[in-house]
Amino acid sequence: MGTKLERIAEISATSRKPEFTSLYHLINADLLKECHKELDGNIADLVQRLKNKSYKPLPTRRVYIPKANGKLRPLGIVSYEDKIVQLAVKKILEAIYEPRFLNCMYGFRPKRGCHEAVKEVYQHVSHGKINFIVDADIKGFFDHIDHEWMMKFLEWHIKDPNILWLIRKYLKAGVMVDGIYEDTEEGTVQGGNISPTLANIYMHNVLTLWFKLIIQKEARGECFLVNYADDFVAGFQYKSDAEHYYAALKDRMAKFNLELEESKSRLIEFGRYAEQNRKARGLGKPETFDFLGFTFYYGKSRKGYPWPKVKTSRKKFEKKLKEFKEWLYDNKNQPARNIVKQLNVKLVGYYRYYGVSFNIYKLNAFLHRVQQFLFKAMNRRGCRRTYTWNGFVDMLKCYPLAKPKVYCSLY
């Protein structure tokens, strides 16, 4: 195999315009075995450097991706070697902390996800004695995790100084921004394998454990907390309990180098009596709250009683529509069959997340808008109009768009 690759390198070096028409067959058992041996050698070297503590994580390359609000979200690109070691540390931390995390935590955990978190919130507001919601948002959570507090939390259960040394190395590894090195004095870089687990450990100690041991015990009535990464929502039976928690939450966050985003944090009245209470006070419709891309609101049951429901949040609805519209206009010159085939994959992905109980109306509204975008995109493929509306409908009979369905029941 080495001889063949050397011959390719020789041709590439000596030819003015080399062209290689037969390469795929070179990826055979011999080459893969050779690569495997090199990998084993690299792993052995990595293990040795970990043992003698000469291992040093590389600074994470930081890039920025746009957010829905127009701001930029920092994302870290970690080296392959560091990813391997981080994954090993992550597995060790999960073995320690997964049994200790509270059931109200859903982010970045095995066999838990957004739907389970949304379902738990719905169960509390529909079957519990919940009348008030505290919807809070932490300002730049991942960027402001305090390293010293993080290490103190870890030291409560981890007494191995070598593991603690390695985790601190990752926290202090620094970042590269446009080729310039920057220290990381606080925060955990998003993008690494270890970052979500460290974030969960921080939230466990700062928020969820505190809520269970202090807030719930001091509350006069029923209350709950559901947390997904840095998103969380709390509900209370009595307003006084909600006010106490909201005030204490600000101080609690400040103690651990965190701050609530005031413009996105609020206490609202939310329950089966909210509508009549607000009406008696001369106020408008009951307020709603968003959690993980869904809006929780009060509608009517089949018998006409107030009943909590869930729908796609307006912000996420419009953001996804914009993404679909841009994709359609970028791919409008493909054959209709190919466009619809790829579009259906994207639609089903959308339905799988937003296809929850009560949300079928918003799913159909989304499909209707996408269908309009598809019609307009396919009529901009040239100077002449490609389809009349009737012709477009006939085309969809041949290549139908995926229909919405409910994938997750909240009952």
PLM feature spans:
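Conserved polymerase palm-domain catalytic core
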Residues: 49-63, 68, 100-105, 109-112, ...
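Extended C-terminal regions of large enzymes
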Residues: 370-373, 378, 382-411
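Right-hand nucleic-acid polymerase module
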Residues: 285, 326-386
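A glycine-rich phosphate-binding loop feature that marks nucleotide/adenosyl-phosphate handling sites
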Residues: 224-228, 265-273, 342-346, 363-371, ...
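A conserved non-catalytic segment of reverse transcriptases
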Residues: 172, 260-334
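Electropositive, glycine- and tryptophan-enriched low-complexity nucleic-acid-binding patches
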Residues: 86-87, 91-106
